Each structure stands twice: as C-alpha cells, then as structure tokens.
From Swiss-Prot:
One of its GO terms (cellular component) is cytosol. This is UPF0301 protein RD1_3419. Belongs to the UPF0301 (AlgH) family. Gene3D superfamilies: VC0467-like. It comes from the Bacteria. It comes from Roseobacter denitrificans (strain ATCC 33942 / OCh 114) (Erythrobacter sp. (strain OCh 114)).
Length: 184
C-alpha cells in the first residue's frame, strides 16, 4: 500500500490531541516509514510575517497575512511549504504524487515574499512522521481513514471544514462516527 499523495483523516478515537480531527497529506511513504503535513491546523498566533522577519526577508502586506500551520509534532522549528506544482525550487522540491510540491528551502519563502512563488501554498512548521510499518498499523487499528487528496480540499477550503469535507469525500457523515472502533 503506497499512501504518497493520499490524505489521512483522523478518526474520533484518535488518542493524541495533536492529531484530533487532523487531515494529513502524506508526502513520502516507503517501507522505511512515512512523512506528512497536517493541512488543517493553523496557528493563528504565527503569521508568515513573523517567519520572514526572523529571516530578514522583505515582503508585501498581502504575503505577510498568510497563516502558518502546525504541520506536525516532529521538528517544529523546521519550515515546509506545501504548494501547487506550478512552482519548483531550483534547489529542492519534492513532487508528491504529481499533484503537489513540498519545498523546505529558503528560496521558496523569498519567492513567495517577492510575489513569484506558487499560486497556492500552505506554510507549515513541523511534520508528522512514522517509522516503518507504524502508519499501516495505526490504519489497521482504526486510527485513520484514507482518501484521495484534491487541490480544492488541500488549498481552497477553510481549515475548519477540511476534516468534515475529507470524510464527506468518503461518503461518511462525521455525525455518524463513533469514538469506539472495532473489527467485524
């Protein structure tokens, strides 16, 4: 099972509060493990202007209002930009399933600040990571549902609606989900 480019949708039984109602885009997945970015946990207290100011990068007012998201609990001081594929860093962009790009280098922030970045982007601090077999085990234990990622769901919907819309894409009404899971 290759989950690269798929969305993980947290089940109500998710015990870790950092992942409660989380929607995660899986950016890399192999037998060695998985890496993803939470796309629906904005950090209202941190704007991209704070990050750009720390890095001494000048930007327009529009750019400065961009919200930074909590990408996951691993390396929370490290920045990632999840973006549309109209942009590729000359240094290092990971193309995720042909549909998304992920860049973690300074040049993308400079280009976003200068208005030359990707058409769609989410700035993240941190990421979610799993060791080999760990994510597959969590899915088997009913911790996550998986669904296809769409640009609309990832970039266009407000963060507060992404979890319920990801469930709706599977034909699941969140109201009908139970925090208790079992196996038939």
């Amino acid at each position: 099972m290759n989950l690269e480019g798929k969305l993980l949708v947290a089940m109500p039984s998710m015990g870790d509060p950092r992942f409660q109602n989380a929607v995660i885009l899986i950016c890399a997945h192999s037998a060695k493990g998985a890496m993803g970015l939470i796309i629906n946990k904005p950090t209202p207290e941190i704007r991209i202007s704070d990050v750009l100011d720390q890095l001494d990068i000048l930007s327009s007012q529009k750019t400065r209002e961009m919200v930074v998201h909590f990408g996951g609990p691993v390396e929370t001081g490290r920045g990632f930009v999840l973006h549309s594929t109209d942009y590729a860093s000359s240094l290092n962009t990971l193309i995720v399933d042909g549909a998304f790009g992920m860049t973690a280098t300074l040049d993308i922030l400079e280009e976003i600040a200068d208005g030359r970045g990707p058409a769609q982007a989410l700035m993240m601090l941190g990421y979610a990571g799993w060791g080999g077999g760990q994510l597959e085990n969590e899915i088997a234990q009913n911790g996550w549902l998986t669904t296809n990622a769409t640009s609309d769901l990832v970039f266009d919907l407000p963060a507060a609606r992404k979890w319920s819309e990801a469930l709706h894409s599977l034909g699941v009404d969140p109201i009908n989900l139970s925090p208790a899971a079992g196996h038939a």
